Each structure stands twice: as C-alpha cells, then as structure tokens.
Swiss-Prot record:
Annotated PANTHER family: 30S RIBOSOMAL PROTEIN S16, SMALL RIBOSOMAL SUBUNIT PROTEIN BS16M
SUPFAM superfamilies in alphabetical order: Ribosomal protein S16 (SSF54565)
Name of this protein: Small ribosomal subunit protein bS16
Entry keyword set: Ribonucleoprotein, Ribosomal protein
Database matches in Pfam families: Ribosomal_S16 (PF00886)
Stored Gene3D superfamilies: 3.30.1320.10
Ribonucleoprotein recorded as keyword: yes
InterPro entries, per database record: Ribosomal_bS16 (IPR000307), Ribosomal_bS16_CS (IPR020592), Ribosomal_bS16_dom_sf (IPR023803)
Lineage, top ranks: Bacteria, Pseudomonadati, Pseudomonadota, Gammaproteobacteria, Alteromonadales
Entry's Gene Ontology BP terms: translation
HAMAP family: Ribosomal_bS16 (MF_00385)
Organism: Shewanella sediminis (strain HAW-EB3)
Entry GO terms, CC: cytoplasm; small ribosomal subunit
Family statement: Belongs to the bacterial ribosomal protein bS16 family.
Amino acid sequence: MVTIRLARGGAKKRPFYNIVVADSRNARDGRFIERVGFFNPMARGQEETLRLDLARVEHWVATGAATSDRVAKLIKDARKAAA
C-alpha cells in the first residue's frame, strides 16, 4: 500500500521531516517514490515551517495513496494557508 508520510532527517534533537510518498512496507527513512514537501517543526524567524506540493499530493491521493494522521493535518494546514 502506498502512503504519504514523514521521513525523519536532521540532527539529534533538531528534527526535520521530508514528506514522502512511499510503499508502507519500506522503512520510515528508507526508499521512497517521490518527495512532495518538507516539515520543519524547529523553524525560527523567517525560516519556512512547511512546504508542500499540493498538486502532487492530490495526484497521489486520487491514485489511492493513504496519508498518515500527521500528514493529513499538515495537508489541512497547507490548504488553509494557501487559501
């Protein structure tokens, strides 16, 4: 099953997440199909907290990809900010 989920990056105590489309059988930080954005929960000042390619997310959801709970909330926030 294809899922849209977070893949952790960054340093210790400084998380940074790539929002990726991946097969659910692959490891969290393992192989992915496509990177559709990022989420930086530790952003400061003018740094971007969230960037998401909503067109690609819509494409993957239309083809049957499931979203994780956290990514679903991030998509909702991105849509609200874009409107």
